[in-house]
UniProtKB/Swiss-Prot annotation:
<dbReference type="Pfam" id="PF00793">
    <property type="entry name" value="DAHP_synth_1"/>
</dbReference>
<keyword id="KW-0448">Lipopolysaccharide biosynthesis</keyword>
<keyword id="KW-0808">Transferase</keyword>
<dbReference type="GO" id="GO:0019294">
    <property type="term" value="P:keto-3-deoxy-D-manno-octulosonic acid biosynthetic process"/>
</dbReference>
<dbReference type="InterPro" id="IPR013785">
    <property type="entry name" value="Aldolase_TIM"/>
</dbReference>
<comment type="pathway">
    <text>Bacterial outer membrane biogenesis; lipopolysaccharide biosynthesis.</text>
</comment>
<comment type="pathway">
    <text>Carbohydrate biosynthesis; 3-deoxy-D-manno-octulosonate biosynthesis; 3-deoxy-D-manno-octulosonate from D-ribulose 5-phosphate: step 2/3.</text>
</comment>
<dbReference type="InterPro" id="IPR006218">
    <property type="entry name" value="DAHP1/KDSA"/>
</dbReference>
<keyword id="KW-0963">Cytoplasm</keyword>
<dbReference type="GO" id="GO:0008676">
    <property type="term" value="F:3-deoxy-8-phosphooctulonate synthase activity"/>
</dbReference>
<dbReference type="InterPro" id="IPR006269">
    <property type="entry name" value="KDO8P_synthase"/>
</dbReference>
<protein>
    <recommendedName>
        <fullName>2-dehydro-3-deoxyphosphooctonate aldolase</fullName>
        <ecNumber>2.5.1.55</ecNumber>
    </recommendedName>
</protein>
<dbReference type="GO" id="GO:0005737">
    <property type="term" value="C:cytoplasm"/>
</dbReference>
<comment type="similarity">
    <text>Belongs to the KdsA family.</text>
</comment>
């Protein structure tokens, strides 16, 4: 499949989805998109800018959710035009799907909603590439049912995304077997390196996180041979309005991406060991 002008999957080099969890302001969106576009261009990594206009599943009613669909889409359109990069954003059950699909290149469905049949069908009917996040409660082989629903709309541009699985209360773990298992769906497989280190509800009224493990899990995922890496980043994660504890510090990303590119090339240049 293709996103904008580049191929995804089938042993192609990994692509990156990255940006702040939520659109905090137009200035921050432009600054982060510009920086990430420059870094990925220098490294030769295909890039999709990610940020959300609404975070509908925040822990607390008092948490910052975003700038709303109208302002958010206006900013994403400006990012896309200014830096010539594709963009991805989350959609929810009450999102005006057609309106969002006119602007973005990829629609992303939240993990909590992966079993909502009507929601998945309506998103996929927009005819855009869709990144479906696997629920924290779902076995990797059960994603085949989700993919079958999605492709029943005639949309073959479906990706599946691992973002950790619930491990008791307020904790997630990443089963790297999941990435290999989900390849059986025939869809490109994406690893969400930052939500996988989230501690859901770990700070009481908001989620915590362990960003120090993002590099570890990212490298492990590269060893599996993934098609895409999802990594939320922020200029100052400790001041982020959403998911700061598990966001990657933006100004440290270039050196790390360079390492991941080397790992990706090494793994994909080797024959698969069949047992």
């Amino acid at each position: 499949m293709k996103i904008a002008n580049f191929e995804v999957g089938n042993g192609k080099p990994f692509f990156l989805m990255s940006g702040p969890c939520v659109i905090e302001s137009e200035q921050m969106a432009m600054d982060t998109a510009g920086y990430l576009a420059e870094v990925t261009r220098d490294l030769g990594i295909n890039f999709v800018y990610k940020s959300s206009f609404d975070k509908a599943n925040r822990s607390s009613i008092n948490s910052f959710r975003g700038l709303g669909v109208d302002k958010g889409l206006e900013i994403l359109a400006k990012v896309k035009k200014t830096y010539n990069v594709p963009v991805v954003t989350d959609v929810h059950e009450d999102t005006p799907f057609a309106e969002v699909a006119e602007v973005v290149d990829v629609l992303q469905t939240p993990a909590f909603l992966c079993r909502q049949t009507n929601f998945i069908l309506e998103v996929c009917k927009q005819g855009k590439p869709v990144n479906i996040k696997k629920g924290q409660f779902l076995a990797p082989w059960d994603m085949q049912h989700v993919v079958t629903k999605a492709k029943s709309t005639g949309n073959e541009q479906i990706m599946v995304c691992e973002r950790g699985v619930s491990f008791g209360y307020n904790n997630l773990v990443s089963d790297m077997r999941s990435l290999e298992i989900m390849k059986a769906t025939g869809c490109p497989v994406v690893f969400d390196a930052t939500h996988s280190v989230q501690l859901p509800g770990g700070q009481g009224s908001s989620s915590g996180g362990q960003r120090e493990f993002v590099p570890v899990l990212s490298k492990a995922a590269m060893a599996v041979g993934i098609d895409g890496l999802f990594m939320e980043t922020h200029p100052n994660p400790d001041e982020a309005k959403s998911d700061g504890p598990n966001s990657f510090p933006m100004y440290k990303i270039k050196e790390f991406l360079s390492l991941l590119k080397e790992l990706d090339h090494l793994v994909k240049s080797q024959p698969k060991t069949e047992l």
